């Protein structure tokens, strides 16, 4: 699965460290990621490969940091182009694939928090934690946590699998679901 990156370690604590030349850049545009694929594996651009306008620390895998590059239009060069994130699961699992999936979640969250849901004023990134803060009314918004369950239903050597009809990749999957509002 995407998160199975052992022996590597994912660190999602917020940090304000400066990007280094060999750190990785996660640049999303809609439902695409600026990257390239080599031998079925995802390759992410490095800080030294792009002209970043504003990098936002996302997380680290081991000692390697990943940064979000928002509102940028990177040119397709050196094999890098915008790849449909719905097809990421077709690639070989590894730290770059985990970074792409986790980064997309943060990208979508930051993109959806541009304006305060309480007063409508523009939000700002917190300077003390991973949060968006409204300077007008003080409303603070944190990334959503969506509890989920994935189960294997089996009878001896038989296994119940599902297949999602409207997904770009038509793979079989275990039965899965999310906790909705009001459920426990």
Map each language-model feature to its residues.
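N-terminal alpha-helical interaction blocks
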Residues: 1-94
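Short N-terminal secondary-structure initiator segments
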Residues: 18-39, 99-119, 182
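Residues in well-ordered beta-strands of folded domains
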Residues: 27, 59-60, 68-70, 124, ...
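Short N-terminal helix-initiation segments at or just after the protein's N-terminus
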Residues: 93-99, 169-171
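Acidic, metal-coordinating catalytic segment for phosphate/diphosphate chemistry
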Residues: 100-101, 105-149
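N-terminal strand-loop-strand
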Residues: 132-174
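The catalytic Nudix box helix
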Residues: 173-184
């Amino acid at each position: 699965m995407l998160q199975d990156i052992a022996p590597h370690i994912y660190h999602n604590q917020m940090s304000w460290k400066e990007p280094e030349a060999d750190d990785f850049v996660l640049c999303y545009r809609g439902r695409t990621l600026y990257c390239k694929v080599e031998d079925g594996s995802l390759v992410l651009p490095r800080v030294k490969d792009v002209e970043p306008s504003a990098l936002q620390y996302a997380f680290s895998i081991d000692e390697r940091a990943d940064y979000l590059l928002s509102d940028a239009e990177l040119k397709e060069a050196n094999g890098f182009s915008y790849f449909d994130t719905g097809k990421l699961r077709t690639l070989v699992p590894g730290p770059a694939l985990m970074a792409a999936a986790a980064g997309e979640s943060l990208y979508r969250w930051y993109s959806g928090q541009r304006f305060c849901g309480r007063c409508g004023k523009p939000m700002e990134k917190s300077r003390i934690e991973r949060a968006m803060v409204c300077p007008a009314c003080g409303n603070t918004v944190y990334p959503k946590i969506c509890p989920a369950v994935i189960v294997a239903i089996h009878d001896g050597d038989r296994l119940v699998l599902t297949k999602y009809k409207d997904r770009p990749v038509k793979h079989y999957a275990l039965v899965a679901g999310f906790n909705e509002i009001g459920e426990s």
